[in-house]
Each structure stands twice: as C-alpha cells, then as structure tokens.
Amino acid sequence: MGDGPNWRSLPEPSRFVGSDPSPPVPRAPGGDTCPVGLAVIDAPWGVRAGPVLFRAPVQGSAKIAVARMLERGEGMTDQRHCYAGVDWASESHHVFLTDGDGRKIGERVFRHGGEGLAEMAAWLMATSGAVEGDEIQVAIEVPHGPVVETLIERGFKVNAINPKQMDRFRDRFTMAGAKDDSRDAEVMASALRTDPRCFRLLAVSDPVVIELREWSRIAEDLSAERNRLTNRMREQLWRYFPALLELENDLGAEWLLDLWDTVPTPDKAARIREATIAKLLKRHRIRRFDAPPCARYIAPAAAQGRRRNDRIRQRPRHYAHCPHPPRQPAAQTGASSAGWPDRQPHRNRAGGAGAEEAA
C-alpha cells in the first residue's frame, strides 16, 4: 500500500464548449482523501480542472452523489454572474446587488410603477456592468406580478422562493424578528448565490395560462369579499333579526337576500302573508320547506322585536318621571383631595331622603 495512495494523474481536459469535461472518476482502495470529480475554472488564461478532495473518507454512494452535484454546478458560484435580491412591496421595492463572491455592489429603493420598474432594470444593468440581462440572477419571494414580469421581459433570470423558506435563510444573518427591507434583500441575494437549488427559476408563461391565472385571482378576491360581507350581515342579523339566521347557513343565498329585502325588520315580518313567502320560494326554486314553516320561523322574532322596540320607546318616559335630587353648589357638597365631589351613599326609594326627614 505504501505511505499513501498512489493516484494516477488525471488527464488535463481540453477547452470545451457544451460538452461534459469530467473524466472517469478514479477509485481508491483507501486513504484520507478521495477525488470525486473535477472543479472546472474558466479563467481568462484558460480552462483548468483538478480533482476535488475530501479530508474525511468518502465512500460509495456519497462519493457518487457529490460528483453528480459538481457536474450539475451545485455547490459552486459562477463568478461571471451577479446576484440581486428584491424585497418587493405594494409601494416600493428594495434591491440589493452582489457579485459572484458575495461582495456588495449596490443597494437602492425603487417606487412601484412603470417608471420605477424600468429604472430598476436599467440600474441593475448599469451597476453590475452586465452586457446581457441573463448575466444577473434575481431572487424574489413572489412567482408572479408586475415586478417579475418586467424583469423576465428584460431578460433577467428571475428565481422565486417561498417566504417561509426565506425565513430560515434570514437566521444566517440575524436572530432579530423585526422587519428590515435592506436585510431581507441581502439575504435573498446571498441565498441565491450559495443555495440556488432552493429557488425555482421562472419563465414566461403562456398567454392562456396568464389569463386563467388572472381570472382565478379575481374569483378568489370576489370570494373573500363575499365572505367578508356575509360575516358583517350575520353580525347585524344576530343583533336585531336572528330568526333569519335559522333559515339558511349561507347568508349570500339569493332567496334569503330577497326575503330580507321583502321583510327588512321584524315588524314587517309579522305582517307578511304566507302567499308572498310562497311566491318568493317558488321563484327561487326552494323546496326544502314551504311558506308556513318559514312564516313560523320569523313570526316569534317579529313579536320579540316589537317588545324590544316598546321597551326602548318607554325608557325616555320612565327617565322623565324619575325623581332627581336638586343639584347643590360644589362649595356645599365638598370635594375630595383629588378634586372630585364626595360620593353620597346610595339610598333606595323606601329609605330615601323623605324617610330620614320623617325620622
């Protein structure tokens, strides 16, 4: 065996374009270092390749996995590319630009809009010194939208990542949970440079796919707005007309809205005829119940509403007939050290001021 592994020299690859430069990986009987592939460096003075060595023993499938990873270009950064992180928002976008070694090239904030996005693309090209847009890798937390579409149209390679996954990369820089646009943009640029496998390269979608995506987004927005309005309706009906809530779980149903428009208050619900309810149910093809059960649902609520309205109307009259003690000047009543008048003990009508005077 000797003092160490006797490696045969790897052949120096010739300059290649678009071909696989990796020669067959040599197998070693043992040792502390195991070459698993070639690290290719495209420098101005030529292309060089050398074995990648591990200081710990690497055997079997692990060696093959690392070799395949190096063949795909993972684990190495391309010095010819620049990496930009875009922390997007509804009003402004924070951009952080680095080179292939992770050194900061520039940082700037752009307003959201047509002019702002065009200025962002021009600034990336001018600051990085790139000739083509595909020399700049851009990281962003959203897979679609005007920012993504503008950058793709200008030729940039846009890569998307899930915001939850981005939070884990943020722990590399700081453990603080406060929102920082500059730090988030820097984290995205650094993560794209070191871990490109965690990102998803975006491409221009088919026009039909874009149209379907916009229609589905509109449908989701309308559904969310409908839920918001029905929740407000449920709260209001629970306050003054809870009987309607027992008729239908979906407060956005057309027949229930029509019924509510016909009897907006419990007083009107008490005067509605069953024939009117029957016509309404027939018009909307509601066969779960007939008019009499529906009328029985809303009749008790109407009576309860009338009783409550009577109590509300009687409160001012009761308050007007209540005896009020005459107000006395502040000098006679006295004041506490805090400046508030001294509170008198509560006395009911049976043992009030008249009873004390009689005693």
Curated annotation (Swiss-Prot):
One record GO biological process: DNA transposition
Keyword DNA-binding: yes
Matching InterPro entries: Transp_IS110-like_N (IPR002525), Transpos_IS110 (IPR047650)
Region (Disordered): 1-31, 318-359
Entry keyword set: DNA recombination, DNA-binding, Plasmid, Transposable element, Transposition
GO molecular function: DNA binding; transposase activity
Family the UniProt entry places it in: Belongs to the transposase 9 family.
Protein name: Putative transposase y4uE
